[in-house]
Amino acid sequence: MTGQTVEWKELEPGEYKIALTVTNGAGLSATDEVIVYVNYVGRWSDLSIGGNTSNSPVDIEFSFPSTQNQETGNTIKRAAGELIYPKEDEDCTDVVFGDGNNCRAKIDLYGFNSTDEQVANTSAIGLEQRTYGDCEENTDCVWLQFTGSYHFAESQWKDGEWTMTIRNEMVNDLDIESLTIRLLYK
């Protein structure tokens, strides 16, 4: 038995149609077509984000491709960002002495479409509600999700190169435990 191995490298997330053809020693062959879904998970750990010292927030941007092509069936199902960071800034300096309000960290995720239009953000989530997933007691966990059939549709914000942005509006530099971006195709 002999065969051929095909290796795919550096594929964009999405849907791909492939065909496998098997030919026996007598020259008879059969072909089977399948669809392969290439998903993506990117995780960044131990980040730091600067403080808002000039009355404008500090952003760290992460771009990702999204495809929503109903004609070919190459459609993103979901894009999600998961942000985890410590609740308290460990090297905090009280701006208003004794107040301590600036020591309680609050970092948000913002999502922008391919034309830099803001689609959604986590800023309305209260400090006590930042417990998405398996969030430990001393960390905050926020999640921002976009669904393919709604967010990436032609009638809404469209597909293309989207951006997930970590935003710090606080005065303090803050640590970030991790950011995970997941792209899932059907």
Residue ranges and their predicted role:
Residues 4-7, 32, 58-60, 148:
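Short strand-edge motifs at loop-to-beta-strand transitions and within beta-strands
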